[in-house]
């Protein structure tokens, strides 16, 4: 029987994963909080102490640091003398290690964190097990991200848990532990930058960098301009997160944490022009994120309007000469690699909330056309573009998009039809190829009816309301095509 060690701080999906492993005849071992969660779910789980014949000591600081664990993980199964030594020491082979680490980054990001809190959230046993298992990827499966659970189970079922896949998991492990170590170094080397003020002048503020990864705002290289403000940092992070969702040349304009214009194109110049045309008023004083190099042509366009921050993976020398003529504009060079961080957190009074990032992608094949009328190809393209954008707009969010840009954005209203009204009132165009995109389902048919009255012919929304049929009937009445994604994008 194969053996797996499960020890996770992020419990998302661990119960379902453990059940699946049990059904596949894995013997499970765990520690502390993970073990309690699995026991509460009536999963047959053993303590790691049964492997080590040694208790957890020092408030859990020493649990898995034992030859019975690391020998079972590190043994090279192609070497008979390794296996003989295991038999002599009565050590069992470990086939899978599932570990994610103490939440150090989340802990040190809290404004009231103490050094003691930080120290207690430095994981020792977890990285050691991960690195050991990753080193022995030829024989051991190592999982650090909950998003890999489902694929691992499917591969086990289909006998496809091969060395090449285990090697890909190994790379994720060393990338993860590298970022974790960087966060610890950055915290203890006093990586706190005092800002001029916070959201408003009466609020003091500082910026704590828990990572210097070059694909994050914290690790950005500032090429020009004065110090980033508190609001600049938040807006820049929002713009960066959205532009990374796109593969094609894309420009994202953000104002007060909401996109005000998003454009795609055959070139980055064309993409920026589409974003600018989407709302040439709101872009004034905003943040622009671009996922391609800024050249002279684009620099001239950017120079012609007032912008607080421009983000791009590269700027040509000629582009920099143009843009640096404005002394206050901030130019940030950032790697557009997708951030591997799987969680985000928000401070609340007395604590903080932690959740998985809303980065699950839905493809056209995952969606359902709920109406009699099928979308045209242009409508599909408009809906897919809009569906990416709406995830970055404050709820209730309703936006309009065509296949190259947003054309109207309604954000942050307390009722959905109110957001729809704003999006439609501000629309730069409405025609058959413009889609209305909603981040949540329609509780009744009024939004669809309002859209129909203003010429909308395509709608995409999550579905899931007990009154979905009302919206479907309303769409059919007006000959509107409506697609349901099965997934919502609330953003608070």
From Swiss-Prot:
GO terms for molecular function: IMP cyclohydrolase activity; phosphoribosylaminoimidazolecarboxamide formyltransferase activity. InterPro entries: AICAR_Tfase_dup_dom_sf (IPR024051), Cytidine_deaminase-like (IPR016193), MGS-like_dom (IPR011607), MGS-like_dom_sf (IPR036914), PurH-like (IPR002695). Keywords: Hydrolase, Multifunctional enzyme, Purine biosynthesis, Transferase. Residues 1-144 form the MGS-like domain. It catalyses: (6R)-10-formyltetrahydrofolate + 5-amino-1-(5-phospho-beta-D-ribosyl)imidazole-4-carboxamide = 5-formamido-1-(5-phospho-D-ribosyl)imidazole-4-carboxamide + (6S)-5,6,7,8-tetrahydrofolate; IMP + H2O = 5-formamido-1-(5-phospho-D-ribosyl)imidazole-4-carboxamide. Its EC number is 2.1.2.3, 3.5.4.10. It holds the Pfam family MGS. Pathway: Purine metabolism; IMP biosynthesis via de novo pathway; 5-formamido-1-(5-phospho-D-ribosyl)imidazole-4-carboxamide from 5-amino-1-(5-phospho-D-ribosyl)imidazole-4-carboxamide (10-formyl THF route): step 1/1; Purine metabolism; IMP biosynthesis via de novo pathway; IMP from 5-formamido-1-(5-phospho-D-ribosyl)imidazole-4-carboxamide: step 1/1. It comes from the Bacteria. One of its GO terms (cellular component) is cytosol. GO terms for biological process: 'de novo' IMP biosynthetic process. Belongs to the PurH family. The IMP cyclohydrolase activity resides in the N-terminal region. This is Bifunctional purine biosynthesis protein PurH. It comes from Staphylococcus epidermidis (strain ATCC 35984 / DSM 28319 / BCRC 17069 / CCUG 31568 / BM 3577 / RP62A).
């Amino acid at each position: 029987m194969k053996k797996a060690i499960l020890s996770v701080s992020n419990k998302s999906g661990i119960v379902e994963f453990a059940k699946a492993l049990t059904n596949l005849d894995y013997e499970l071992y765990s520690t502390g909080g993970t073990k309690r969660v699995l026991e509460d779910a009536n999963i047959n789980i053993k303590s790691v102490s049964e492997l080590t014949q040694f208790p957890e000591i020092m408030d859990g600081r020493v649990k898995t640091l034992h030859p019975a664990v690391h020998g079972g993980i590190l043994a090279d199964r192609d070497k008979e003398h390794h296996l003989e030594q295991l038999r002599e020491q009565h050590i069992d082979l470990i086939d899978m290690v599932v570990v994610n680490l103490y939440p150090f980054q989340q802990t040190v990001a809290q404004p009231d964190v103490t050094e003691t809190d930080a120290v207690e959230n430095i994981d020792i046993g977890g990285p050691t097990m991960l690195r050991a298992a990753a080193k022995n990827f030829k024989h051991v499966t190592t999982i650090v991200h909950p998003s890999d659970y489902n694929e691992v189970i499917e591969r086990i079922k289909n006998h496809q848990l091969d060395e090449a896949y285990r090697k890909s998991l190994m790379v994720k492990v060393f990338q993860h532990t590298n970022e974790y170590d960087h966060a610890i170094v950055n915290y203890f080397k006093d990586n706190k930058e005092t800002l001029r003020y916070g959201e408003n002048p009466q609020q003091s503020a500082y910026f704590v960098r828990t990572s210097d990864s070059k694909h994050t705002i914290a690790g950005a290289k500032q090429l020009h301009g004065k110090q980033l403000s508190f609001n600049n940092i938040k807006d820049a992070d929002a713009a960066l997160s959205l532009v990374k969702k796109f593969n094609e040349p894309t420009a994202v304009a953000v104002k007060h944490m909401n996109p005000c214009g998003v454009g795609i194109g055959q070139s980055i110049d064309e993409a920026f022009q589409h974003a600018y045309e989407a709302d040439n008023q709101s872009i004034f004083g905003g943040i622009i994120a671009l996922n391609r190099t800024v050249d002279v042509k684009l620099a001239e366009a950017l120079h012609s309007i007032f912008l607080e921050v421009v983000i791009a993976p590269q700027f040509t020398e000629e582009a920099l000469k143009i843009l640096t003529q404005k002394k206050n504009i901030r130019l940030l060079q950032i790697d557009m690699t997708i951030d591997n961080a799987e969680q985000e957190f928000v401070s609340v009074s007395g604590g903080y909330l932690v959740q998985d990032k809303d980065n699950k992608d839905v493809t056209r094949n995952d969606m359902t056309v709920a109406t009699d009328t099928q979308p045209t190809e242009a409508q599909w393209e408009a809906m897919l573009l809009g569906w990416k954008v709406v995830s970055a707009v404050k709820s209730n969010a309703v936006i309009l998009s065509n296949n190259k840009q947003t054309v109207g954005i309604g954000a942050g209203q307390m009722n959905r039809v109110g957001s729809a009204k704003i999006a439609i009132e501000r629309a730069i165009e409405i025609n058959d190829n413009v889609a209305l995109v909603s981040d949540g389902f329609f509780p009744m048919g009024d939004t669809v009816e309002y859209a129909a009255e203003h010429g909308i012919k395509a709608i995409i929304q999550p579905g899931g309301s007990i009154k979905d049929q009302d919206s479907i009937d309303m769409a059919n009445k007006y000959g509107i095509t409506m697609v349901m994604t099965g997934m919502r994008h609330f953003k608070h």
